[in-house]
């Protein structure tokens, strides 16, 4: 993630420095605190409905959106840190959320290298990583539902409330997709909001790991292939990288699609839903 120019409130900057110092960062009273941009973000987003990311002394402090569910976030952190799942994820520096000065939930992470726009995406490793994630069943019974349907629901609600635009056709399409996607033929442990910006690695030449477990949980594994599938269907992702990703996923035993043949029956609904979510997000920004 890149840094963006932003005026950071003093209380937040001091909080970030303290958190960084408490979690291995060499942060002093005047150590620089930077705001990090989300994928596609060009300017600061003061809206407390959005997550905010700050970096200081090798530590990333994520202040979650206002109203985030404490118990659900705690459960998701527990899931990604347990032995069956920890090998897939960049691990938090603190295993439970804390509170920022304004009362918003906060999680603490190491700053890792992310995929640069001019770097070739690791399609083979991504396919293998997702397949192995989807084949893993973490221990315990407290595994939450993935946040994919909730995110689709928020997109539909936003489109329904949007003034002056005749978007009822898009709302109806979203509702139809949501109805179909509530009854998945298979479930697995999924990331829930997978895109190339959700990959990070602690060392420049090391393996890639997943970032951002805010939507992870039990869900249809096809959701984690939905974005690249949608890009490929729209002609935005060439055949070669899509084929590499799909073949690697299948070779590693990924359950989202059949081991051979046309995968589109399984990928079409979540790919359409991912496109609708992206459209709503574009209108919102």
Please give the residue ranges for each predicted region.
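Active-site acidic catalytic loop and adjacent metal/ATP-binding pocket
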Residues: 40-61, 178-223, 235
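All-alpha amphipathic helical-bundle segments outside canonical DNA-binding/catalytic cores
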Residues: 257-271
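A cross-family kinase active-site recognition segment
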Residues: 113-168, 185-187, 218
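A conserved alpha-helical element in kinase catalytic cores
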Residues: 60-103, 113, 117-133
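Active-site activation/catalytic loop segments of kinase-like enzymes and analogous catalytic loops
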Residues: 222-255, 273-285
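Protein kinase-like catalytic domain
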Residues: 84, 134-138, 233, 253
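Conserved NTP-binding catalytic cores of kinases and kinase-like/nucleotidyltransferase enzymes
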Residues: 1-89, 202-208
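A glycine-centered beta->alpha junction motif in the catalytic cores
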Residues: 102-119, 153-161, 272-285
């Amino acid at each position: 993630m890149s840094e963006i120019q932003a005026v950071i409130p003093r209380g937040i900057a001091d909080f970030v420095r303290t958190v960084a110092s408490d979690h291995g960062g060499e942060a002093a009273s005047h150590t620089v605190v930077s705001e990090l941009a989300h994928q596609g973000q060009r300017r600061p987003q003061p809206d407390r409905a959005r997550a905010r990311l700050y970096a200081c002394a090798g530590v990333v402090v994520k202040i979650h959106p206002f109203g985030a569910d404490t118990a659900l976030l705690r459960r998701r952190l527990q899931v990604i840190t347990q032995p069956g799942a920890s090998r897939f994820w960049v691990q938090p520096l603190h295993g439970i959320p804390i509170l920022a000065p304004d009362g918003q939930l906060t999680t603490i992470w190491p700053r890792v290298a992310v995929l640069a726009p001019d770097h070739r995406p690791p399609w083979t490793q991504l396919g293998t990583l997702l397949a192995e994630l989807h084949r893993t069943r973490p221990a315990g019974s407290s595994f939450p539902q993935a946040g994919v349907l909730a995110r689709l629901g928020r997109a539909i609600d936003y489109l329904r409330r949007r003034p002056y635009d005749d978007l009822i056709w898009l709302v109806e399409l979203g509702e139809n997709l949501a109805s179909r996607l509530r009854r998945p033929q298979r479930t697995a442990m999924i990331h829930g909001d997978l895109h190339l910006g959700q990959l990070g690695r602690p060392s420049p030449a090391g393996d890639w790991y997943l970032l951002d477990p805010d939507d992870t949980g039990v869900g249809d594994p096809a959701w984690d292939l939905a974005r690249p599938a949608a890009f490929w269907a729209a002609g935005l992702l060439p055949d070669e990288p899509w084929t590499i990703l799909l073949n690697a996923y299948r070779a590693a035993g990924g359950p989202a699609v059949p081991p051979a043949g046309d995968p589109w029956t399984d990928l079409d609904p979540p790919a359409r839903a991912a496109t609708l979510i992206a459209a709503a997000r574009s209108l919102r920004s």
